[in-house]
């Protein structure tokens, strides 16, 4: 009889006396509390990591322009990295060829399309100078462009 008192009932067997039943109930309750505490700690740690990342990306991180060629690296002259020159969003002000990817790339000295393109041939001296192909602009359009981007030229 003492052998049965010393060893608790094995898993799956019904408890044969009151002390064994209480021990099983206590072990089950302890397992539930340990599982609940583990889940709570996991949720708390993931939430804390999300808060830290949100604070970092909203207050500390400053994006690096991918198309800069030989300028001083730093924040844009507008003062804020969230808006562009005329109040547009940072993604719209970055340029037409940028993507919304969250991947951060190292800045390049020369954009790849300009590096691969050969220099244009010199025009003959007797032909009139040919400028880039774009539509002619009126005087008010030039004023709007210079007002929208004061440091671009």
Swiss-Prot record:
Organism: Homo sapiens
Annotated region described as Disordered, given as residue ranges: 1-24, 66-153
PANTHER family linked: TRANSMEMBRANE PROTEIN INAFM2-RELATED, ZGC:153157
Gene: INAFM2
Keyword Phosphoprotein: no
Entry's transmembrane regions: 36-56
UniProt feature, compositional bias: Pro residues: 118-131
Compartment list: Membrane
Signal peptide bounds: none
Biased composition (Low complexity): 79-101
Protein name according to UniProt: Putative transmembrane protein INAFM2
Composition bias type Basic and acidic residues, residue spans: 1-23
GO CC annotation: membrane
Keyword terms: Membrane, Transmembrane, Transmembrane helix
Transmembrane listed as a keyword: yes
UniProt topology in membrane: Single-pass membrane protein
């Amino acid at each position: 009889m003492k052998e049965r008192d010393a060893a608790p009932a094995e898993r799956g067997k019904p408890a044969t006396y009151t002390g064994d039943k209480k021990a099983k109930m206590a072990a089950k309750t302890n397992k539930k509390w340990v599982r609940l505490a583990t889940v709570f700690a996991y949720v708390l740690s993931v939430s804390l990591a999300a808060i830290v990342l949100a604070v970092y990306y909203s207050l500390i991180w400053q994006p690096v322009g991918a198309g800069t060629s030989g300028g001083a690296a730093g924040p844009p002259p507008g003062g804020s990295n969230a808006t562009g020159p005329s109040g547009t969003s940072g993604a719209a002000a970055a340029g037409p060829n940028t993507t919304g990817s969250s991947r951060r790339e190292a800045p390049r000295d020369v954009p790849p399309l300009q590096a691969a393109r050969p220099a244009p041939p010199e025009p003959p001296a007797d032909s009139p100078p040919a400028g880039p192909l774009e539509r002619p602009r009126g005087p008010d359009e030039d004023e709007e462009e210079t007002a929208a981007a004061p440091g671009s030229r």
